[in-house]
Amino acid sequence: MIDDPDYPRQWEADVVLGDGGTARLRPIRSDDADRLRSFHSRLSKETVYNRFFAFRPVLSDPDIARFTQVDHVDRVALVATLRDDIIGVVRYDRLPGSSDGEVAFVVEDAHQGRGLGPALLEHLAAAGRERGITRFVADTLPTNRAMLGVFRTAGFQVHRVLADGYVELSFPIRPTDSSVSVMRDREHRAEARSVKRLLAPRSVAVIGASREPGAPGHELLHSLLSSGFCGPVFPVNPAAAEVGGLTAYSDVREVPGPVDLALIAVPAAEVADVVRACGVKGVHGLVIVSGGFADAGPEGRARLEEVVALARESGMRLIGPNAMGVVNTDPAVRLFATFAAGAPAAGRVGVFSQSGALAGSFLAEASRRSLGLSSFVSIGDRADVSGNDLLQYWRADERTEVVLLHLQGFGNPRKFARIAREVGRVKPVVALKSGHGQPGRSDAAVGALFASAGVVRVGSLAQLFEVAQLFALQPLPAGRRVGILGNSSALAAMAADACHDLGLDVPPLDETSQVRLRELTGTTQTVNPVDLGPFAGPAELRSALTVLGDSGQVDAVLAVVVPPPRGRPEVVAELGAALREAPPAMTVLATFLGGDGVPAGLAAPGDGAPGRGSIPSYASPEAAALALSRAMDYAEWRARPEGEVPELRRFDVDAAKDRLVGLDTDGRWLPLPEVTALLQPLGIDIWPTSLAADAEQAVAAAQALGWPVALKAVAEQWRHRLDVGAVRLGLTGPDELRAAFGDVRSVVGPGPLYVQPMAPPGVSTVVRLVQDSSAGALLSLRLGGVAVDLLVDPVTRTLPLTDRDARALVRSIRGHQLLTGAPGSAPADVEALEDLLLRVAQLAEALPGVAELVLDPVLVQRNGVAPLHVGLRLREPGADPDRGPRRLGSSYAVL
């Protein structure tokens, strides 16, 4: 019970440890006295000596009072708990009159080596920064290798001095690139191992195992046994002595020996008691297939919260509830723990489905296409383990070469983008995102998130597998040049049209290659597409592939092959064999006899499923061209250098934060002077602007700003309407300005108007930053102008933004030639525009309370940029789950 009004609940966190288990971190409480005594009693003599520099068999009452009674400011302590037992403590005491905190920690011997020390230190450092601590100091014994190791690997710049037999340590606790990198590397390893414990268990209990065919507990047990799971399986059913030919147990706690994974298929009302029993048993992980949670209203959600809390209290991670199960085809595991139909062969594709209903479709489609899977997870309610966790696992899994995702939402879009980008640098991530038609969910935002992270987006389940089979079976294309050949001129023409429509190049072959084709195949249609004629056989197909490979003029070959007239089965098989003999570095795909997947004739040997070098087939040339275009887009993204987030000069975040104090955070647009002052320390200089209540104030402002001037309406709907007289430009004197003031007022109505000095000419652009609920912070750019506002969509990217991202963003908008130098015009200062984009992006990182920032227009001039107007709204910044120390997300994520 917490009776301390100053208790900092924001410091409570569930964390994944280095071995894949979890622990609860929280501030110490006054009611922890007995837990602390028990914790101390379980420490070895060596651990006690290393902590106190003396052997202290028990803690005295004054010790207990001093350790548990803290002020959460100058004296802070965090504990790690497992099943209500304290297993680790970390604390700091502020040194008098300083911003230094003297730090000490101790971890129970049984839990040392699990990564608990670094996790405690991360969270204590975050708490210390919140309380004004800037540096930690500590004294330790040279023999305390565990403590020295924690400090050494934490990523902080640790200064060490040996004095009087002790090691004096000190280090600043402000996050650095090094410390953040180390923290995220630990996070990756921990989350990957936590998923591995679920997908590679040594033993499994099926709780709710049933004798009734069709019941989830029956199908789970049958699937496990029929697939030959490599470890022991324990049915748990209090009403049966035997299930499926195996001894059944009435309670998981009665199972002899350890249980790594529990599959739970009992009514929703019983799940909490089962999870509690699993915690006592020491089960590592849970897969809950039971429904009646997130889909059952407030009562179901409350049930879900309880189940997740129980699992985390006992250090268990869980998949589900409402999951369809998991599959791991590794021959050393052979875990088929699902009641969905379909048993795919072993392969190289990892599949994540956020929808239980689609799980069966995934497995059936993979089997139909002969696409082998490495693993499969149906996540259900996503109460704990999420797509981000699976990405961490697949990033490290050597058996997985391609990742497929079906997503309905993002629990933590910023973290998803970061991890997906890391995975995408080594293996493709293909995603089908549903739900974009729902209110409040921006499809453009999701597209920006995927584009920034290198995620290959598809629009249907069929496209998901069509793209996946190309990635899984063929090398990435080296460019966008496509050679098309086959025995049907009509299909070849359709393929060429589809390639052109998707931005692929179908180049004409050079004369040398055409001569060779005529000599070797007898065809006269040699330009590209290459039509071998309806009677072409394996020899002609093989020769044409050789010529295309030798030409150096194509990066991929799309073969369109229809059954030859009166073709014998052996001829069809030989045609497939000829396609497989293409040069190994060339990407080859086919529309082969109208089939999709990998027909037997196109399959290369593999371990269960067709192996690398198999030729994927598509039902139509359009489907093949689409898959190829996605592969080429991904290959280009992967080959593009990532760039770096540059350190900007004249970018004073502290000064900007000072100017935030007292500003409205209710989402309304702030007054222009406040916004201008806020942006100035960040190097974003808004064009000088004065607000004039009447014509005489306008004249006085013009005298101060300098002639000529522009006169503009304040209201956004009028601000750019030069066409209706709401904006007047190039006013050169007082009389002209007075007359213009009256004219503009007659259009827009009463109220003040803006007066600005005329800006040098430039290309009008619009820069916008907005916080999107589905994808996080988004930065967009487009050309400006009234007509462009109606006709051109902006190009949008998620953050962080590197220097190369900024350069690519400028060159990706429609009409970018106006910036880079259209015929007859000089180029604008695109480097200044890129600098502005980087500043806005880093502003979003530094000031998460900025809900929206609009710079419209920004004139990109020959030298520099001129933001003529700015709008900015603030919000109360919520906690960013991807900033600060690592922690598990909330127990229930709305999909």
Predicted regions, residues:
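Long, contiguous binding/interaction regions
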Residues: 1-197, 201
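Catalytic-core regions of core metabolic enzymes
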Residues: 174-895
